[in-house]
């Protein structure tokens, strides 16, 4: 299972958007955070981060067009990255493990009307996690409980329940994302 949605915080600078994403990982896992403010979405290092990092922050995310947009959309949904590392004779198959998040000061960042991968939200302010520490024990206990619920529902094949976005969900998301579309 791969997270195919990018949670994006949009708001003015200095309100702890990136800081929040960094601190959402407890200190023992922060080595698995990467801030990619100048990411080249076709670069092998960027693709390798999907396997080696837990959270990839697309900081200062702006409008993405053309080849860059196609590469980003493809990378978000890939289950496996097949890359040849420098000096290796053969390709390595790297499982997609990382989730993406993003920040932007710009409101209009979406260029693709069909883009269901972006989940942008206006943020006025975020309490500094440096000054008000995150209660990791309770946050991650809730995450584990939700993960177990998803696993059980999938295993039990509960009728009418899915863990992916439905057509209705995608329509609602498109309507919401309309306010973040780049004007033509």
Predicted feature locations:
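AAA+/SF3 P-loop NTPase mechanochemical coupling elements
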Residues: 46-51, 85-103
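Short glycine-/polar-rich loops that comprise or flank the Walker A/P-loop
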Residues: 52-54, 96-99, 113-119
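Conserved catalytic/switch belt of AAA+ P-loop NTPases
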Residues: 69-93
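C-terminal, non-catalytic macromolecule-binding modules
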Residues: 124-153
